[in-house]
Design a protein with these regions (language model features):
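Conserved HGGG/HGGXW glycine-rich cap/lid loop of the alpha/beta-hydrolase fold
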Residues: 24-78
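Flexible "cap/lid" loop of the alpha/beta hydrolase fold
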Residues: 130-164
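Conserved alpha/beta-hydrolase "nucleophile elbow" surrounding the catalytic nucleophile
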Residues: 45-47, 110-112, 241
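Short beta-strand/loop motif that positions the catalytic acidic residue
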Residues: 232, 238-240, 244
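Active-site loop/oxyanion-hole signature of alpha/beta-hydrolase fold enzymes
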Residues: 24, 68-113, 143, 284
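Catalytic active-site module of serine/aspartate enzymes centered on a nucleophile-bearing elbow/loop
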Residues: 260-294
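Conserved alpha/beta-hydrolase "acid-adjacent" motif
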Residues: 245-251
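Conserved alpha/beta-hydrolase catalytic His-Asp/Glu region
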Residues: 166-230
Length: 294
């Protein structure tokens, strides 16, 4: 199935829930199993995203119960009362899983910034399995497009010094969103590119405040998986796109060797947007890994 078809399939099944996690109202969506498996898969989205960004992958995981929260300050979830750093997000994830009784029984998936949140959580607690999609496995400023990352960093730091209204307009600017989307998308399929751009225009500005956007950005470049891989004892699947702009494929291969128990799957002709460009393939690999780690 195509990405838009998988997304539609998931949205038809999704049930909205709210829970108080880390003292704030948090929203998550549950996609019931078709009855063929009792396993639970939890998907954690990336920076400036929300649960909708991973629905195409969720649509390919129909045999499982799937949970997709909006991280604090993004989507429909309220922002935290303190700083939105990586430790706060990992603590929130831990409390989320405990509250839902899924801390010891779930397979936890993280994409991009979500891989850092899941990785830090997994370095402290074990899960049935951990799946990292295009994990941030090297310092952000040393990736294939380090120059663009430096410009982006300056962009977010500038936003902090501007009046709230202007900073909000700047960060949510459709032009800025389209530049990012155009750089990240690797597919040559025009229809898919248009769909990807629409997803970003609809969802990439879904953050609660300039404070959240700036603090979470700092969190996204504060560390990388190479610094915590050796602490993650759960079985790990790394789904790495060969054309990823954030972490090169060779770095993904090298860092994978430092996990106690990791498997790497490489996706050719795909970039950072695996969840849009190859969600069906990602779901197939996730399903196979879940089945081998029940």
């Amino acid at each position: 199935m195509l990405a838009d078809e998988l997304t539609t399939k998931a949205r038809q099944l999704g049930v909205r829930h709210t829970a108080t996690i880390s003292g704030v109202k948090s929203v998550y969506y549950e996609y019931p199993s078709d009855g063929s498996s009792a396993e639970t898969v939890v998907l954690i989205h990336g920076y400036r995203g929300n649960h909708r960004g991973l629905e195409a992958i969720g649509g390919g995981l129909g045999k499982y119960r799937v949970l997709m929260p909006d991280l604090p300050g993004f989507g429909e979830s309220m922002e935290l009362t303190g700083v939105h750093d990586l430790d706060a997000y990992a603590n929130w994830l831990e409390q989320f899983l405990i509250t839902l009784g899924a801390d010891k029984t779930s397979h936890v998936v993280g994409h991009s910034f979500g891989s850092l949140v899941v990785g830090l959580y997994a370095s402290r607690r074990s899960s049935k399995s951990v799946i990292l999609i295009n994990p941030v496995s090297a310092p952000a400023l040393s990736g294939p497009r380090a120059f663009l990352t430096k410009i982006t960093s300056a962009f977010y730091h500038l936003s902090r010094s501007l009046p709230e209204g202007f900073a909000n307009w700047l960060l949510r600017s459709p032009i800025a969103v389209m530049v990012m989307s155009s750089v990240m998308a690797k597919t040559t399929n025009r229809s898919l590119r248009r769909w990807i751009h629409k997803q970003h225009l609809d969802n990439f500005s879904d953050f609660a405040s300039v404070k959240v956007a700036a603090e979470a950005y700092d969190a996204s470049i504060s560390t990388d998986l190479s610094k915590m891989a050796y602490l993650i004892t759960s079985p790990v699947l790394i789904i790495a796109a060969v054309l990823d702009d954030i972490t090169s494929i060779q770095v993904q291969r090298d860092v994978a060797e430092t996990y106690p128990n990791a498997t790497v799957v490489e996706l050719p002709n795909v970039g950072h947007l695996v969840h849009y460009e190859a969600p069906a393939e990602a779901a197939i690999h996730i399903s196979a890994f879940v089945e081998s780690n029940k």
